[in-house]
């Protein structure tokens, strides 16, 4: 009977020591100053490409009946093309940005009219910027000015006095 009581006590002490070791490891991960976890040592982090972020971008209560023409950038009097910008430290990592094809506008005959100006339409958007901290990543919101299309405007004319 004495042997089983000693065995039970040894098991309890081992479980207590294991629990304390786990708590210490968790505390070290939450507070890097308390101790550097093994994963955060240089060279032990997984490659950046293996890290992904999942964001549900479905829009609820959107009107499903309206379809937007896909090639309106070609039918505009100020046509534009899209260029893809890539940044692995940004989410989304790829963003399409408009670039005006001409400095002037296209007239009814399909010719460029240099008496009018083709200018980019800009929209401020929010993106997530990845900030690596050891192996874990945190993200911060960042404003970005994005060219979303082009429009035709009258030029600004300054009169000399």
From Swiss-Prot:
Distribution of this protein across tissues and organs: Expressed by T-helper 17 cells (Th17) (at protein level). The expression pattern reflects the differentiation state. In fully differentiated Th17 cells, IL17A-IL17F heterodimers are produced at higher levels than IL17A-IL17A and IL17F-IL17F dimers. Dominantly secreted in intestine. Expressed by resident cells of the lamina propria, both epithelial cells and immune cell subsets including natural killer cells, dendritic cells, macrophages and various T and B cell subsets. Expressed by epithelial cells and innate immune cells in the colon. Expressed in group 3 innate lymphoid cells.
Gene3D superfamilies the UniProt entry points to: Cystine-knot cytokines
Single GO MF annotation: cytokine activity
One GO term describing the cellular component: extracellular space
Disruption phenotype: Mutant mice are born healthy at the expected Mendelian ratio, are fertile, and have no apparent phenotypic abnormalities. They show increased susceptibility to S.aureus upper respiratory infection. Mutant mice are protected from chemically induced colitis, a model of human inflammatory bowel disease.
Physiological role: Effector cytokine of innate and adaptive immune system involved in antimicrobial host defense and maintenance of tissue integrity. IL17A-IL17F signals via IL17RA-IL17RC heterodimeric receptor complex, triggering homotypic interaction of IL17RA and IL17RC chains with TRAF3IP2 adapter through SEFIR domains. This leads to downstream TRAF6-mediated activation of NF-kappa-B and MAPkinase pathways ultimately resulting in transcriptional activation of cytokines, chemokines, antimicrobial peptides and matrix metalloproteinases, with potential strong immune inflammation.
Assembly information from the UniProt record: Homodimer; disulfide-linked. Heterodimer with IL17A (IL17A-IL17F). Forms complexes with IL17RA and IL17RC receptors with 2:1 binding stoichiometry: two receptor chains for one interleukin molecule. IL17F homodimer forms predominantly complexes with IL17RC homodimer, whereas IL17A-IL17F favors complexes with IL17RA-IL17RC. IL17RA and IL17RC chains cannot distinguish between IL17A and IL17F molecules, potentially enabling the formation of topologically distinct complexes.
Official protein name in the record: Interleukin-17F
Organism: Mus musculus (Mouse)
Recorded name of the encoding gene: Il17f
């Amino acid at each position: 009977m004495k042997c089983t009581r000693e065995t039970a006590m040894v098991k309890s002490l081992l479980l207590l020591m294991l629990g304390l070791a786990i708590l210490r490891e968790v505390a070290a991960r939450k507070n890097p100053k308390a101790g550097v976890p093994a994963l955060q040592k240089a060279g032990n982090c997984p490659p950046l490409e293996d890290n992904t972020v999942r964001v549900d971008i479905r829009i609820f209560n959107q009107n499903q009946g309206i379809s937007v023409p896909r090639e309106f950038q070609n039918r505009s009097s100020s046509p534009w093309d899209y260029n893809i910008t890539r940044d692995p430290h940004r989410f989304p990592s790829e963003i399409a940005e408009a670039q005006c094809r001409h400095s002037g506008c296209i007239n009814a005959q399909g010719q460029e009219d240099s008496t009018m100006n083709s200018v980019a339409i800009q929209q401020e958007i929010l993106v997530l910027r990845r900030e690596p901290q050891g192996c874990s990543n945190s993200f911060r919101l960042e404003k970005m000015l994005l060219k979303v299309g082009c429009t035709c405007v009258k030029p600004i004319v300054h009169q000399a006095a």
